[in-house]
UniProtKB/Swiss-Prot annotation:
Residues modified to Omega-N-methylarginine: R311
Site (Interaction with DNA): K98
Lineage: Eukaryota, Metazoa, Chordata, Craniata, Vertebrata
Cofactor dependence: Zn(2+)
Record text about domains: The N-terminal and C-terminal disordered regions undergo liquid-liquid phase separation (LLPS) following homotetramerization and activation. Post-translational modifications, such as phosphorylation or lactylation affect the ability to undergo LLPS. The nuclear export signal acts as a transcriptional repression domain. The TADI and TADII motifs (residues 17 to 25 and 48 to 56) correspond both to 9aaTAD motifs which are transactivation domains present in a large number of yeast and animal transcription factors.
First-listed, main subcellular location of the protein, grouped into a coarse class: cytoplasm
Protein name: Cellular tumor antigen p53
Residues with N6-lactoyllysine modification: K98, K117
Amino acid sequence: DLWNLLPENNVLSPVLSPPMDDLLLSSEDVENWFDKGPDEALQMSAAPAPKAPTPAASTLAAPTPAISWPLSSSVPSQNTYPGVYGFRLGFIHSGTAKSVTCTYSPSLNKLFCQLAKTCPVQLWVDSTPPPGTRVRAMAIYKKSQHMTEVVRRCPHHERCSDSDGLAPPQHLIRVEGNLRAEYLDDRNTFRHSVVVPYEPPEVGSESTTIHYNYMCNSSCMGGMNRRPILTIITLEDSSGNLLGRNSFEVRVCACPGRDRRTEEENFRKRGEPCPEPPPGSTKRALPTGTNSSPQPKKKPLDGEYFTLKIRGRA
């Protein structure tokens, strides 16, 4: 009766499972063990180690080095060239108040402006250029040791979500309120520029105004890094031939009025010759210096006596 209570598949079986049977040595294996040396016997009994699959990470390329922007192969000219059409620039009169967002110094030929604020630039011509004429704006570094570097925004401002849908994030100069603006990257020089069609002045006006924005501070690390820049404005025909050129220095800062006053005072103290202001500018140049020196105050002389006469007294 107890035998019948056991399960049909006996737990104890004289037949070993196939995996265990493979681990046991047969009589032939034992004979070969003694016939061969111990080193060969160990090689026979040891199962070959399975080859580990090659990890996918090993096929990845080495990390790329930090990006270094290429140097430009050429430096645009910054010399003033009115051309046959008398091309020149002008700026709206603005003072040095603390609240001003954009101000131009004729004595320095320098524009001081805040980040991303409107900077009106007037275009003056003596005669109307041909149809298809374009106006190009490009920034370059002023000092000779930096001229071959391309002016671009700092990495922080490149990542800012302030795009107007037209300008690439690395471009410093933008045109405000003009959907026909084209932002170009030169394949040969790697320089950035923005081009707009030239529009003749409206009725009753003598100049055309383009509103520019500067999208990075002059002090930004990784960008201009306190290096002075120039903005070159060129007048070109439809084929890209030069019709006129003018330029001015730009400083993008938090307080344009204060910085303009400071630089003009330093300029007068140095006594440097005053550059000619643009013919279209409505702001007069500041005097470069004066020969008169402040008169010292006269000190009262001790030991003098004065007589005071009073009328109406007995």
